[in-house]
Amino acid sequence: MRWLLLLLCCPAVWAGSVPLGEHLPALGDLNKPVQSILERRYANIERQHTDFSCGAAAVATILRYAYGHATNERWVMDGMLAMADPEQVKHYGFSMLDMKQYLQMLGMRVRGYRLGDEKLRQVRVPTIVLLNIRGYQHFAVLRAIDRHDRVYLADPALGNRVITFKEFKESWNGILLAVIGAGYRPDAPLPTPLPRSLSEARMGSSPRSMKHPCWNSVFSTKS
């Protein structure tokens, strides 16, 4: 217990690099980057910074981490506000229509789907979903669903999350927004979420593979 108290009382503990060479001379000048728990939680996610910007952050997450666009939550939010009613946005947040109009302005194609369970499991590209989180409507990015029915979410407020299919269905409104455009990278960080832990990696529970999206390949086909 004493070491825990000492650790908690340290005035500044920051993530950085561990100079392994100082402790293991045989390794030479070798630095290993260290990622904090917070950094890992929000890896490859554009975080939301206002109560009403989860939609903008979700759009920015897909544009940046699936398509490689140099953008962020603020730029997307400013762009969507230019086409929306600011007062409505302050009270209710952005809508899927606001997101669709903004993405179409960028030259992306956007389509909404209402899906049943089996079709949902076949989604193979990151999409935007609307969830009910403790009574609040909240946009997040559905990254993938693996063969064990684990749902991988990139949540602008809560970070990278892995929940059960049942939990997802209980909070999801049944509609997702698919974004299709040039520059999609199937090897980008967003379409290939990391497992929560090494134990999941050992289980071979990697999400279903995702290829370059077009309307015919938003969903995987059964063999």
Predicted feature locations:
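Low-complexity, Gly/Ser/Thr/Pro-rich intrinsically disordered linker/tail segments
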Residues: I175-S223
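Active-site-adjacent structural segments surrounding the nucleophilic cysteine of cysteine proteases
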Residues: P11-A82, E87, M203-R208, W215-S223
